[in-house]
């Protein structure tokens, strides 16, 4: 009779013990890049008995020590181990492209993600904002998102999103807040799907697809470009979105 360990290894490609070690290190890499927690706190939080043993294991996996990984102005996503429940067999249309700078007009939102919730599904509030904005503006909508350490709380990630369009007025009213989409090299993905699938989309990109492609993320904002057609599209009586997702890469 096959054991649970055999089933697990067949699904994930590694033993349960190795998976747990890799997940701890991958989780710690995310905390290094997206929070202000100290290396010491991260090491003990991940169950290591010392900072030295944590640093040794981290360097074996990622090629640099935790401090240098954090300080780098890019994010090397290679060797991240996705959680077992994430569908890494999902395929999305992909290409590398160059974007030119573009001014858009809209509004800003911000919220926090507790580190205990990582990896986090996309917020259902965001889904609601997207559909309401598409309907209200009657235009394709951009969403520029950044994820950074919170200066006042090392247990959360600060998330900022700017929703905008290419025109600075709607129904005769001016939209006062401008923002510039920065030019540069991006990995471009196409997504069409319903709410549940969308909520896991960025996790799949970051934890599965980009590491497989050996792509390194540079500094900058993630850009989502939602098509107006999303408002009319339905799938099994569920609203779906049609979007292009751009991630800044080296």
Predicted regions located by residue number:
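Generic hydrophobic, amphipathic alpha-helix propensity
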Residues: 20-25
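A solvent-exposed interaction/effector surface
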Residues: 26, 30-33, 38, 44-250
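HTH DNA-binding helix-turn interface
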Residues: 1, 6-19, 48-49, 58-66
